[in-house]
Regions:
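Interface-prone segments of viral and bacterial extracellular assemblies
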Residues: 1-221
Length: 221
């Protein structure tokens, strides 16, 4: 539906400098991570003068590791060269010294923790995105029974990393999440968001068709 056809993220870097990002980031969305850990994700350099990096757009669980061209950096509250500090409340990291020439700064990210909860299952992440990013009312707009049931079927943790939240459509993210448990998503007739899983057939078959019976397959319409 239309509400899920737009970008995952509505905001973008202004490109005016400082925490709003340099000119090279103008119009780009912030990085987004859910669940995880999401390994080896390239962080955005927001403020080169102050060595400020972004790995999300809100409160996050943790930046579990940070590397400069593969070499690990050490976390410290007052970083010096070879170290960094981590602000999980805003998903920002600050380097203690200038990175190496042609540096690529990558991290292992434990994702979004809005409201104090780190959601890690595909159903919980999908629901959180629908509510916080697309304005779906919870529980009024959610098929809560379906989401609860899928958390029992697919309780394993997943990781979702998006380098630019403006370049990915919400519906595509939902498709990727439900694919992790052979599932589907959509809206019911009462407009509630629902999910399900395509499981193997159950019960006694009324007929069987194999290579002997099937001569050809021809669409009827």
């Amino acid at each position: 539906t239309d509400v899920f056809d737009g970008p995952l993220q509505d905001s973008e870097f202004a490109g005016t400098g400082g925490v709003d990002g340099g000119a090279e980031l103008k119009g780009r969305g912030e990085p987004i991570a859910y669940g995880g850990p999401c390994f080896n994700c390239e962080l955005a350099v927001v403020d080169r003068a102050n060595l400020l990096l972004a790995y999300g757009d809100g409160a996050y669980e943790d930046l579990a590791a940070l590397r400069d061209r593969g070499s690990p950096l050490t976390e410290d509250a007052t970083p010096v060269a070879g170290e960094y500090s981590d602000d999980t409340a805003n998903a920002r990291a600050t380097l203690g010294g200038s990175p190496s020439p042609n540096s690529v700064l990558t991290g292992d990210i434990e994702g979004d923790k809005r409201g104090g909860t780190w959601r890690r299952t595909a159903p919980d992440i999908l629901r959180e995105i629908a509510v916080t990013r697309r304005g779906i009312a919870d529980p009024a707009g959610i098929d809560t029974a379906a989401f609860d049931a899928l958390n029992l079927v697919a309780p394993g943790p997943v990781g979702l990393w998006v380098a630019d939240g403006r370049q990915v459509m919400t519906a595509d993210v939902f498709d990727a999440l439900v694919a992790s448990f052979a599932g589907y998503w959509g809206q019911r007739r009462d407009n509630r968001l629902t999910i399900g899983r395509i499981g193997p057939p159950v019960g006694t078959p009324v007929a069987r068709f194999g290579p002997t019976e099937i001569i050809s397959i021809r669409p009827l319409a």
